[in-house]
Amino acid sequence: WYIASIYITLSLLVLELIRLSQRIKPWFPKWMKGHWQQTKLTLFFLIVFGVTGLMIHAYHTVMNPIVKNVYITLPKAAGDRDSLTIVMMSDLHIGEVIGKDLVQKYVALSNAQHPDMVVLAGDIMDYESRFAENAHIEDDLKQLKAPLGVYIVYGNHEYRANRNAKYRWLQKTGGTLLIDSVVQPDSTFYLIGRDDFIHKKRKSLHSLMEGVDTGKPII
């Protein structure tokens, strides 16, 4: 409902701007001015049906996740490794809508790819941590299978509400938190995880690169 209210408010704002422009410099066609009440009613239902359709589509998309394959060729050699399969998931927004069942579906999809490594790229939680805590969703994320590990970086939602509780909960998921830090999942490449831009004092990429062997692939 929060998202729907935003779209409805924006639509009404646009309509109000159109109405004001008509008062400044009339440009509505005669048929519209002659049937203004019917026009307003039509526009109202268009907004309601449009936002409803958009929300239904968004809900269907969230409830039926798909895997998108992206192939990237790196110019640097990674030892004897000729390929690396990474599952990247972002914006899970675990909360009132995204709960245990859907997270289990995400985990199953990830494991079906047989990845070498999994990266959770921010906004793991929507707002408060209590929904994930009460449902023990950390136990589901522990089921992510990847021989090189599971890595987690912050998004802006990790800084909302009870950020310390979120930090403690993320540590229970079995993943490695990368907050302005660098790791080597194995000896052939580096993985750099930056803090979210909302943290104004986050380290620069240049400082994180200090001590990194630039002859190896860096992700």
PLM region spans:
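Soluble catalytic domains of enzymes that build or remodel membrane lipids, polysaccharides, and related
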Residues: 73-219
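Non-catalytic terminal accessory segments
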Residues: 2-63
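Solvent-exposed, charged interface segments at domain starts and junctions
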Residues: 1-16, 103-117
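Extended recognition/assembly regions associated with phosphoester-bond processing machinery
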Residues: 15, 19-22, 56-58, 70-73, ...
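Alpha-helical transmembrane signal-anchor/signal-peptide segments
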Residues: 61-77
